[in-house]
Swiss-Prot record:
PANTHER family: RAS, DI-RAS, AND RHEB FAMILY MEMBERS OF SMALL GTPASE SUPERFAMILY (PTHR24070). A lipid is attached at C178 (S-geranylgeranyl cysteine). GO terms for biological process: signal transduction. InterPro entries: P-loop_NTPase (IPR027417), Small_GTP-bd (IPR005225), Small_GTPase (IPR001806), Small_GTPase_Ras-type (IPR020849). Keywords: Cell membrane, GTP-binding, Hydrolase, Lipoprotein, Membrane, Methylation, Nucleotide-binding, Prenylation. This is Ras-like protein 1.
Length: 181
């Protein structure tokens, strides 16, 4: 069974945890409790293939930004989540995207733009970035599966493209140890 390491990023309060818990437990969490970092696993079938999603739900608050590089290194794909009722969270997406590309040292990384709490000019940004856009509501569960499953499909496409291009990386395989900050 293929395992996918998914990372959910975005500003504080956009609904990253609510989306993740809705996917994992079919339950909407109404109250806001800032996340430092939570990890979830779920076995799902996507396009006929059984796979294991290893999902890292990250902190959106600025005081935890030092942790970002580490989880960006280990993630295979990223849900870039903003709240459609917060222009600032939408503007922050570009910063997350650039940081992911810098840390991964790659121009193309599997990402899905997720507009949670539904309806802003986000579709055009996703088109400009060349990545899928999914509107979600963690409360009603609208688009929750689609967001995570689309990201897995993006990872598969990315692996396929890299396999076809036969690109070899000269970077050594590195293992990272946990650091206390």
């Amino acid at each position: 069974m293929t395992e996918y390491k998914l990372v959910v990023v975005g500003a504080g309060g956009v609904g990253k945890s609510a989306l993740t818990i809705q996917l994992i437990q079919n339950h909407f969490v109404d109250e806001y409790d800032p996340t430092i970092e939570d990890s979830y696993r779920k076995q799902v079938v996507i396009d006929g293939e059984t796979c294991l999603l290893d999902i890292l739900d990250t902190a959106g608050q600025e005081e935890y930004s030092a942790m970002r590089d580490q989880y960006m290194r280990t993630g295979e794909g990223f849900l870039l989540v903003f709240a459609v009722n917060s222009a600032k969270s939408f503007e922050d997406i570009g910063t997350y995207r650039e940081q992911i590309k810098r840390v991964k040292d790659a121009e193309e990384v599997p990402m899905v733009l997720v507009g949670n709490k539904c309806d802003l000019p986000s579709w055009n940004v996703a088109k400009q970035y060349g990545i899928p856009y999914i509107e979600t509501s963690a409360k009603t569960r609208m688009g929750v599966d689609d967001a995570f499953y689309t990201l897995v499909r993006e990872i598969r496409k990315d692996k396929d493209n890299k396999g076809r291009k036969g690109r070899k990386t000269n970077k050594p395989n590195r293992r990272f140890k946990c650091k206390m900050l």
